[in-house]
Amino acid sequence: IDDVLAMATRPVVMSHGGVKGTCDKTRNLSDDHLRRIAATGGVIGIGYWDEAVCGNDVHAIVAAIRYAVSVAGVDHVGLGSDFDGVITAPFDTSGLAEITQELQSQGMPGVDIAKIMGGNTLRVLRECLPGS
């Protein structure tokens, strides 16, 4: 990630992973990485599996999301599902509402939840894809 960030001229998307601030695993991003991705205008996709969030439930996922928001800002955090069958997630796509509900129950404003649940990723795609 350091090499990518050193040469990035457009928003960097970390499609799926975790953050060391809530789950100190080798693959997860440091606070410095979070800030540097945000500085590119990019998005950090928070994953749903144990190695990414150190848990197998919506609470661990939301803790990682909230931590990333606290470091990178709400405009730079999104979902990183990785629903490809390789990882074990606590739910399938029908369970995404659980993330929304948990963010709401913790007092996050609806406009911020909308950004995390897809708005930030759409913003980057619109900025970066041809014809946008």
Question: What label would you give each PLM region?
Answer:
Residues 91-132:
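Mid-to-C-terminal alpha-helical segments outside catalytic/metal-binding sites
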Residues 16, 44, 82, 113, ...:
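Conserved, mostly hydrophobic/aromatic
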Residues 1-13, 26-41, 59-75:
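Histidine/acidic residue-rich metal-binding segments in metalloenzymes
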Residues 48, 72-93:
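Short acidic/histidine-rich active-site segments
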Residues 18-28, 51-62:
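Active-site glycine- and acidic-residue-rich loops that bind
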Residues 4, 78-80, 114-118:
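Beta-strand segments within the central parallel beta-sheet cores of soluble alpha/beta enzyme folds
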Residues 38-53:
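A conserved active-site cap/scaffold subdomain adjacent to cofactor or substrate pockets
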Residues 8, 18-19, 48-50, 83-85:
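Active-site-proximal loop/turn and secondary-structure-junction residues that shape catalytic pockets
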